[in-house]
Amino acid sequence: MATESTTNTTTIIARADQHDIDLHKASDRVNFGSIKEPIDVPYLLGVQTDSFDWLIGNERWKARVEEDEKNGTNTVAHTSGLDEVFNEISPIENFAQTMSLTFSDPYFEEPRHTVQECKEKDYTYSAPLYVNAEFENGDTGEIKSQTVFMGDFPLQTPHGTFIIGGTERVIVSQLVRSPGVYFDRQQDRTSDKEVFGAKIIPSRGAWLEFEIDKKDQPQVRVDRKRKQSAIVFLMAIGMTKSEIAQAFKDYPLVLDALEKETLGTQDEALVDLYRKIRPADTPTPEAGKNLLDSFYFNTKRYDLARVGRYKINRKLGVEADFNDRSLHQEDIIATIKYLVALHDGAATFPGKRNGEDVDLRVDVDDIDHFGNRRIRQVGELIQNQLRTGLSRMERVVRERMTTQDAEAITPQSLINIRPVNATIKEFFGTSQLSQFMDQNNPLSGVTNKRRLSALGPGGLSRDRASMEVRDVHPSHFGRMCPIESPEGPNIGLIGSLATFGRVNPFGFIETPYRKVVNGHVTDEVEYMTADRDLDHVIAQANQELDENGNFVQKSALARVGEEEAVDVPVSSVDYMDVSPRQMVSLGASLIPFLEHDEGHRALMGTNMQRQAVPLIESERPLVGTGSEWRAANDSGDVIKSEKDGVVTYVSADLIRVMNDDGTTSSYKLAKFQRSNQTTCYNQRPIVHDGERVEAGSVMADGPAIQNGDLALGKNLLIAFMPWNGYNYEDAVIISQRLVQDDTLSSIHIEEYEIDARETKLGAEEITRDLPNVGEDAVANLDERGIIRIGAEVEAGDILVGKVTPKGETELTPEERLLRAIFGEKSREVRDTSLRVPHGETGTVIGVKEITREDAEEDGDELPNGVNQMIRVYIAQHRKITVGDKLSGRHGNKGCISRILPEEDMPFLADGTPVDIMLNPLGVPSRMNLGQVLELHLGWIAHSGWDISLDPNLEAEWKKLIPSGAEKAEPNTPVATPVFDGVKPEVLKGLLSTTLPNRDGDRLVGPDGKATLFDGRTGEPYTKPISVGYMYMLKLHHLVDDKIHARSTGPYSMITQQPLGGKAQFGGQRFGEMEVWALEAYGAAYTLHEMMTTKSDDVDGRVRVYGAIVKGDNLPPAGIPESFKVLLKEMQSLSLNVEVLNAEGVAIDMKDEDDDPASSADDLGFNIGARPDAAAKEDQKAEEPEYQ
């Protein structure tokens, strides 16, 4: 953030250090925030990169472990994920336990390809994983050691993504219930008594549930089976009655149950337990013991995980080591004691913490509390898949140990890596948590990587998720954003990590607080999990402080436990929030005046920023929040200098820097690449020759970034006024200027691919020589049959010429020999060229060709049966047009209804026409007042201001202006941080001190309104109108992608009705309700035509086509195909159905119609398949027929 301070907390300097601004290391915004943040926002992609570093145990992770050990903070896991999982599975022993296989020291070789190569050639960015495997033969004492290849392991790119098969993907973090012990309270259905229960939930293994029923009897449920006495269970795990009596001497409820228990020994208890769990089997004490051991005491099958042990220790006050991941007798005893204390209504429970006796609070658990929900990050998710793959491999190893000759066994011969590779590949390719990366703009990419999802394997399902799970919870504060969430069925199940949130080694989200000592706020910052919040009194970040950091007021508004915020004496405050934007996510923190927007609209605004399309020329917002710099900087879309140095060479695609240490660094820029969302990904240098850079300086902007600041849209002159009804119901009127100046134009790049395969009838061929195609259609193809770069193409144009052999029979060996000797006579081929699909157009900007020969030379991999693969890239220049969707940052979205000539737009007194007219009725009912305040501050920033122009030197609002923000030149970008922004009274004061224009006039008055003149008549409007600059975004919902029309096209094979949807070149559905509408009007002929000729009367539509071509009257309709399908369906149910005519005579329904194409030929005209419809043929599951 650009605000800085030394000791004085209230006075802040409004601009960043000029040195940093000059080096592109900070934003030059004038900041109106009044609160100094004691720490920087953590690295925004850390939630992805830190976790993967831990998994593979790389140098970055080792450095963090070293620092952690030095500081003694215990914020980093000290064993890497791969080491953990290989240690768990080792040793693999055979059934006789005479042989063992142990794994250790996993390591990676260098990746085979760079990230860029993987994107270009459809590879997976991965590195070979090796592990040291040691086989020991217990009979002979022989040990064989080998380094074993465990397959190619996908690696993370520096920006937290994975390249899988050439496409960029993100693994989303998952929100799940933490392992541990949970207590709940439920009302008994038959009586009014409350029934208390406890569940011990492991990370892996069977649940163990205890309950005190309505008769006050302690019960246990093993692995979700029948309930039985908890006393029997205690005896079964090895406790005698006297030991139980001693352990529970202070708990009469347990002692009463013990007296009533008739069983006397452990064996009897085991038999009783086994009988109830497995009623079909013969119960014996050994079987009972083996069953219990396999459920709860076998470390291979039962795992609490470190986090489960941590939660049990914390809840029950036991002190087992965090690495002890199994369940113990002490845990079970403590669980029952706590449950009895809860049942008896006790307030506290004796336990231990850090070696001291403490009284723990007794209460039921809230499962939606963030102390009980944890994050499975990318590293843990991949580790779990690896664990699954290795356990499958373990079975193979065991089998091979028994079948292979003991003398000849080597580690390599035992190991089969296929199951490991298959599980990892399946996870990256098909898991719900492995998502196609959102590359619409830099913000959408960062948000995608910071997303938290409660869905996925082991999580919730959207159909069964309750309102409670979806709702905002007090423990979300500073951890998960209460605003950013989808609007559909996933609302509340998918969230976003808060700005300052970070994930601790146990997977719980922590948020930072400033420590308060005796009413003095220090700069010491402590990160806390949600369950620690409850034990402290925490004040808000905007609590007023004096220059020494002491509270100005005697009392402060604070959170105490889970109660509503209350006023407390400042002496009792323990902590204070670090920043007002602490509670919201990055996306929400980019909305200026968020505090004045209603929640639902803020949610829409946050989501719509992610849909903004990068424009040809990016322009950063005049009114920002100060988060723009960080969002762009951490997105990975800017190029930053790695070392201090001087720029020696700059071109559009390369920057070279001579570093101070004598080395030279070269930085390659991405030029006009296609993103996952078909937007244009392009980087531009912002440094020049001879310029000094420091490590971390931004040297090149990415898409939707200007000078290192996020720039999603444009600053446009807005007037809030209706105009002839054209902006009714959120419609938007824009000026022709935005079209002709390419203000809101964007570039979209589509990729089209074709391959030439080996078929049964011979090889397909890429060629310019196509059957039945005129010279003009192949004019833009080169001699190979591939389109030239720079060609302008439209729907139906040929991009790559291809012919496929056609014929019914396979050639005999003799025929093939003769053809090989004498060359081919005119072979029967059909044209299967790649054509531009319907509705698409543009300029060819690139062609990539891979042939089998090239592939073998370069080591590229082409799929089996493919001889040649060609990709064509077409760029579209899309100007803003009627039907496109525009939006602001406050959920104020609208569709363009009219583009007015510039001269017809209303204009200001100096002749400046406005760019956009918005309907003022869009504000009051939506309650997103932030847009109006942004409008006014936008005008102030555009005009410039000088507070000395207000003659009242003692004006109260002037005291709220931070130092450095007293005056500014026109077009100075400003920042108004969320919840700490420009106050309305300051806004009013600044409006009265804006700089006059060159004529000496102030066009907008102190109330933010201006006199506008009608562009058509030149007359002034009767009332003044709110005018100012607002940041408007062009969203990805472009009319060019949605508009669609069809005359003839593909039909469904079964029903013979037109297919649906633009992708299939389908028709418009005339549904049930539309039929009712025609029925209501009695439009019988129209209705008849809709349901026969225009739908699925195959003969009829051919005859109608012929009649239209010849100019004849339309023939009567025939029988719809769907009627025949209905008859067939009834016949399949063994119903004999006959169709009778008016005279009652049975009509012979033809089973098979004549081929429609031949019927057409009989009528003397030809109807063929539309070439552009054929391009989408393979996208439909049902085989379409063409008419």
UniProtKB/Swiss-Prot annotation:
Listed under subunit, the entry gives:
The RNAP catalytic core consists of 2 alpha, 1 beta, 1 beta' and 1 omega subunit. When a sigma factor is associated with the core the holoenzyme is formed, which can initiate transcription.
Report the NCBIfam families cross-referenced here. Answer: PRK00405.1, rpoB
Pfam families, alphabetically?
RNA_pol_Rpb2_1 (PF04563), RNA_pol_Rpb2_2 (PF04561), RNA_pol_Rpb2_3 (PF04565), RNA_pol_Rpb2_45 (PF10385), RNA_pol_Rpb2_6 (PF00562), RNA_pol_Rpb2_7 (PF04560)
Q: What does this protein do?
A: DNA-dependent RNA polymerase catalyzes the transcription of DNA into RNA using the four ribonucleoside triphosphates as substrates.
Q: Which GO terms describe its cellular component?
A: DNA-directed RNA polymerase complex
Q: Which organism's genome codes for this protein?
A: Bifidobacterium longum (strain DJO10A)
Protein name per the record: DNA-directed RNA polymerase subunit beta
**Lineage per the UniProt record:** Bacteria, Bacillati, Actinomycetota, Actinomycetes, Bifidobacteriales
Q: Does the keyword Manganese apply?
A: no
